[in-house]
């Protein structure tokens, strides 16, 4: 098969070779010095379902800025789907005591979250005027209704059974969320890991109703404190805990960027779904996934090593916790 450019262009002849591989027509051609291959089986478009993907942007208004709003949120949903996928893999790896592999997976989740953080900058190009041209068309549609976002929160450890209510009209999504609600979270798997390593994790934290809100325990905080105080003795647990902490750190940064973007676009208006908008998002910043991993940091003290006596008795930390000041005096 030969192909020629139009007469106005320099004539180029390309020979396409056709073969049959595994019963599928395959083709090969040399273009710009590169051998390009394709077949009638799996193509780029078929693999990625690009026809379906690129036809899924259906505005409800005739306002041009709505396309940005739709694509921004659709891409966010895809990244959240990947984060959920990786979180499930990480839980399987921790359950199997494959901590090195779990660290790699947690690193990937952190990278996904960092990408999601920067994606808010795209939505921030939407001015208040731009958004108001189509906001009314959205009616009560709201990110609060994202079942994937809720799935990710459940996977990481923030469980709220009452949040299933908004999915009552979709039995399939509600059932999927309910399954995650009643399953152990990433933090539950970490507690099981601590127990396997001999730490005194209370039985009621290991064998509990996973659909209920987790209540922190002093014994769990003590376990993390021991690991962080003596990292050389518990290096794999210490290293894993830092990866887990990074996941929450980036998730909270994503929440913060979400809140600031909403504030920039709509101020303190009520959200489209009826929530308090910015005020609701501010409250979410105080909802931790791994509470004892954060709490024990306040109790850590500096080792008495030469002239390093700062905070040796923990008084400075307690004062900072009491008055809310920065440990550097700011």
Regions found by a protein language model. Give the residues of each.
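Surface-exposed peri-terminal alpha-helical interaction modules
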Residues: 3, 8-330
């Amino acid at each position: 098969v030969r192909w020629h450019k139009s007469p106005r262009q320099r004539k180029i002849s390309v020979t396409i070779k056709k073969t049959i591989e595994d019963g599928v027509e395959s083709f090969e051609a040399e273009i710009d010095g590169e051998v390009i291959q394709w077949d009638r089986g799996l193509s780029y478009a078929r693999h990625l379902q690009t026809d379906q993907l690129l036809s899924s942007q259906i505005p409800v208004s005739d306002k041009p800025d709505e396309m940005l709003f739709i694509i921004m949120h659709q891409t966010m949903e895809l990244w959240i789907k990947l984060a959920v996928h990786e979180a499930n893999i990480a839980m399987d790896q921790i359950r199997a005591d494959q901590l090195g592999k779990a660290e790699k997976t947690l690193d990937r989740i952190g990278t996904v979250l960092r990408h999601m953080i920067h994606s808010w900058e795209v939505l921030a190009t939407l001015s208040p005027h731009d958004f108001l041209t189509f906001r009314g068309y959205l009616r009560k549609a709201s990110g609060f209704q994202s079942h994937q976002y809720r799935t990710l929160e459940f996977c990481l450890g923030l469980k709220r059974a009452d949040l299933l209510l908004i999915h009552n009209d979709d039995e399939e999504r509600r059932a999927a969320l309910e399954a995650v609600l009643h399953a152990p979270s990433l933090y539950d798997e970490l507690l099981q890991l601590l127990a396997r390593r001999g730490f005194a994790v209370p039985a009621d934290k290991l064998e509990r109703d996973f659909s209920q809100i987790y209540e922190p325990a002093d014994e769990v905080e003590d376990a993390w404190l021991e690991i962080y105080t003596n990292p050389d003795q518990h290096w794999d647990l210490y290293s894993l805990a830092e990866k887990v902490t990074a996941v929450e750190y980036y998730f909270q940064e994503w929440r913060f960027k979400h809140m600031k973007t909403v504030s920039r676009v709509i101020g303190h208006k009520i959200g489209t779904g009826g929530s308090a908008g910015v005020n609701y998002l501010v409250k979410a910043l105080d909802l931790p996934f791994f509470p004892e991993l954060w709490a024990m940091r306040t109790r850590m003290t500096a080792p008495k090593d030469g002239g390093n006596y700062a905070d040796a008795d923990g008084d400075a930390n307690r004062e900072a916790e009491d008055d809310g000041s920065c440990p550097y005096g700011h």
